[in-house]
């Protein structure tokens, strides 16, 4: 489609699934301007030019989008710049206007999925969608298994037995300060070998290793006030990461999941495998066979989106990366400016 000069803004939304690097979408024009968004090294990459500028932007924080699961993507573009959203939350912004109007009146956007990449639910919006609207259009990740009782069926337990990576989600509360207990546990052959608990130290995730030694991963903090909390344990890429209420609280080296449980035959919530119950309740829980990204985890906890706009696309002397200066507008209308004080290299 074509947009006249002076446009109020435009948005595109779609869903994609990728198992390999390759192209996603591309904007063509009658001259040499235009851009393409593709996957490189399992992360989103945007490069091209408009009538005003050229750009090549590596969205490294989106790494691992080639996991074979569906992801939502949104782009908004105005004369003030453009923003890219992954799974409902903004993941990057640029000063470039990615709209067709910035590349010429005949510019058109095309879907160009490469081999091993699927695209669905593509839509064009003749306005700039708000972060809230984009979040509402983004579906939550689909769990492999949801708990409908305090324990899983034998069939569902078998589905987990070979998983070496994935994600655990649980929403719990205890009855008040100083009350703790097990949120989720798993075992095999009568022995508990995996446990997720709220303790006086914080959130503790531990798995019994093959040499009979417990591997313990802890997010230190206090989540025992009696309020509802969302706990996510993300296991993959060589680490265990623990999120509480949508935010990362611990990144710990090591990888241990249900596949580490010898002869797995039991998975329970709200108690350990011997029946000792949490001093509170687990309202709902789910298990994912994929390693959810930050945006998907925030979506599970209904974290409000943050709207940001970059000031520069590169540092001095063409530095590809730089320490980001920032401008924050408070509710009072006061603008707070922040920047790195170092001046020794161009990145500063």
List each model region and its residues.
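Extracellular glycan-associated modules
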Residues: 1-298, 302-303
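Asp-box/BNR beta-propeller blade signature and adjacent active/binding-site loops
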Residues: 300-348
């Amino acid at each position: 489609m074509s947009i006249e000069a002076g446009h109020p803004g435009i948005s595109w939304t779609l869903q994609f699934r990728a198992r390999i690097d390759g192209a996603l979408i591309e904007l063509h024009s009658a001259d040499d301007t235009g851009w393409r968004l593709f996957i490189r090294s399992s992360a989103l990459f945007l490069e091209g030019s408009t009538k005003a500028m050229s750009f090549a932007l590596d969205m490294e924080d989106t790494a691992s989008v080639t996991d074979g699961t569906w992801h939502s993507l949104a782009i908004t573009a105005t004369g003030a710049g453009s923003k890219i959203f992954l799974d409902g939350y903004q993941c990057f912004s640029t000063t470039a206007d990615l709209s067709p109007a910035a590349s010429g009146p005949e510019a058109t956007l095309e879907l160009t999925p490469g081999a091993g990449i699927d695209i669905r639910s593509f839509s064009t919006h003749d306005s700039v969608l708000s972060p809230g609207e984009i979040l509402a259009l983004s579906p939550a990740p689909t769990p492999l298994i949801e708990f409908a009782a305090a324990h899983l069926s034998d069939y569902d337990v078998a589905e987990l037995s070979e998983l070496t990576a994935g994600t655990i989600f649980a929403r719990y509360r205890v009855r008040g300060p100083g009350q703790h207990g097990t949120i989720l546990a798993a075992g095999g052959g009568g022995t508990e070998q995996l446990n997720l608990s709220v303790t006086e130290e914080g959130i503790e995730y531990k798995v019994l290793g093959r040499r009979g030694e417990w591997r313990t991963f802890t997010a230190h903090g206090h989540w025992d006030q009696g309020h509802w909390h969302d706990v996510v344990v993300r296991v993959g890429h060589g680490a265990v990461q623990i999120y509480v209420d949508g935010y990362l609280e611990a990144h710990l080296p090591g990888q241990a999941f249900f596949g580490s449980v010898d002869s797995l035959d039991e998975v329970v919530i709200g108690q350990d495998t011997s029946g000792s119950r949490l001093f509170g309740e687990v309202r709902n829980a789910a298990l994912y066979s994929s390693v959810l990204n930050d945006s998907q985890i925030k979506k599970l906890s209904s974290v409000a989106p943050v709207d940001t706009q970059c000031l520069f696309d590169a540092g001095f002397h063409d530095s590809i990366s730089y320490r980001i200066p920032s401008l924050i507008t408070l509710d009072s209308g006061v603008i707070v400016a922040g920047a790195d004080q170092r001046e020794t290299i161009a990145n500063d």
